[in-house]
Amino acid sequence: GFKSNSIGLHGISLGAVPVIFAANKEQNVNAIWVDSSLAEFSMVLQDEIARYGLSIEFGPAVSFFGKLLSGVDPIDLNPAERLTNDQNYFFTHGDKDQRMLVRHFHYFEKYNEENNIKSEFWLAENSYHVDGMFKYPDLYAAKMKKFFEDNLK
């Protein structure tokens, strides 16, 4: 087994969403690294609809059929609302991300400040989706190492 204070998670892009949800259910996870995640489903729905040049009026229909097909209401899939005050988070994002727009990163910043969520943030300059780890591998690794060492004692 593992000591309860030695468990950390790392989630990238859409993979960060189940990491956040899992950490919410497992309070022994002390440190969560989130790279290029969506913050709220309604935001990503708007982003994707706009990406294809469709009107936002399609949003409710997309949500309805998503729920009908999966049995899960996509509106309930809001990672920001699953963050806890008992865990530590590190958020990173590319400032030029066109896949998961940087407004998700800023949403996390604002939400975490308003809700006293223990978190650190790094916006990787001149970086697109999940680019930070590739454009700045040494800095990315150093930040990750420090974050996990500081929070998994």
How would you label these PLM feature ranges?
Residues H106-K153:
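C-terminal catalytic histidine-bearing segment of alpha/beta-hydrolase fold enzymes
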Residues S4, V29-N30, S119:
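Core-facing hydrophobic residues within beta-strands of well-ordered domains
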